[in-house]
Amino acid sequence: MTKKFLALALGAMLVGILFVSCEKENNTANTIVEQNDSIPAHNPETMGFDSIGASMACFSVDDFRQVRFSRGNLQYQASTDTWRFAEHQYECIGNANANISAAYNGWIDLFGWGTSGWNSGANAYQPWSSSITASDYYIAGDENNSFTGSYVNADWGVYNAIVQGGNRAGLWRTLTAEEWQYIFSHRDNAEQLYGFATIDGKYHGVVILPDNWALPENICFTSGTQGWTINQFSLEQWARMEEAGAIFLPAAGLRNGNFVSKINEEGLYWTSSTYYNFGKNISFRENMINPRNVHERNYGFSVRLVLR
């Protein structure tokens, strides 16, 4: 069975698909599970990540819905056509992204917009696409199309089975720009629920805290964007933050064609949204975060998925 047929079949068999989401009113989950399904239900009493790599903590993305983040950034190996999540939240591939190609047997984690591997009608839709022409990434050749309706399979998480992420298509998705903006700006106490950090003295990025956050004992956290060193965690301290529900977006840099830059200096994460000929994204660097950024779609940015 081809990936395209499998994705279409999964979209039609709604009753048989697992759906897990955070329920905002009581912070529990609604779960529909087919018989003999091994994917765990959400347990709000437990934090960290479950067996398919979904955070047990919940994050509001509008006034009524919450989501659960994946355990790490999305990664891809072209030689085996395999998708996975980074083993650690602070992990990124770095300069090896310059080796991007259809035959590359290493891993990449910087992708052009909409490059799930589904033939969306764009000239560049494969994960290894490295064209530097922004219009090559327009879904069906139209700059206005995004990951909705008949084009939902352009979303990396919807179209692909992710090993150690449930290993089945249709379980994950990319946040919209509006959802990212809600996380950073519109949640209750939003300004206190994120901050820059350095992990193990070398990994720079932004920490996002869940709605119901309780700081672990003997650990300090300062919200805001006053430099990478505003929060410094050892690996042991970060493990405790992670177990309490914290999410970390590493400053993984960017790629243009085969040129990689700004590793550990900037983080740029695609959303599913468009703005005219641009793709919307969140961007951050030392002392600044912009959840309303836009950029040409040919650039390779990070992808962080949430459970559908």
Model-derived features: where do they sit?
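Sec-dependent bacterial lipoprotein signal peptides
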Residues: 1-20
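Basic side chains
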Residues: 3-4, 24, 71, 304, ...
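Intrinsically disordered, low-complexity segments enriched in small/polar residues
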Residues: 9, 14, 46, 51, ...
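Bacterial Sec-dependent N-terminal signal peptides
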Residues: 16-58, 305
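Intrinsically disordered, low-complexity coil segments
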Residues: 63, 166-167
